[in-house]
Amino acid sequence: AADLEAMGVEQMQPVITGKKTYIAPFVNAEKPQYLVIEDSFPNGRPALEKGFGVYMADRETVNLSERMKVTVCLNPVHSATGPLGVVQGYELFAHMLNTNEDMMKMARMIAYDEGLPVVPNPGILSPQAFVDELFHDRFPNEYLGDTNMRLSVDVSQMVGIRFGETIKAYVKK
C-alpha cells in the first residue's frame, strides 16, 4: 500500500472491518499462473485453454503436473526453508531468500540439485522452466507477502509427500 501511495495512487491502505477482516483496494499478484485441468467433460466445455496459464490434459498429465509442483519443485523448498526462516527471525519468505545467501543456496539445492534430476516431466510444463521461474520471478517477489510462519504450520504433516517421492525416486535409481 505504501509503495502504491508513493507512486501517487491515493487511499491504498487496507481497511479492517469490525470482524477483523482485512480488505485492500488492490491485489498482490504474480505473473506465473498454472491451472492444469483434466479434459474430461462429457457434456462439452468452453474453451478454457484460451485463458492465460490454463492447460487441458489427460488425468496422467494432471497428476504428473501436481506431483512436479507438490513433491519436487515448489512445496519442498517452502517446507525445508520456511521453518528455518521462522527460527532465524525472518517474517517474509521472499525477504529471507533475498537477503540470506545461505538460505537461497539451500533452496536452490533442494530444487535444482535434488529435485530436478528425478522429477517426472508432465510434458505440458517444463520442470526446469518452472523452477527457473520460481527463483527468478516468484520467490524474490516480496509483494506476495508469503510468511515463513504460514509455510511452517503443516510441515510435520507434509514431510512424506514433500520429500518422500523424491527419496523414493533416488532409491529406485
Stretches with model-predicted labels:
Residues 1-173:
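Substrate/ligand-engaging "lid" and interaction regions
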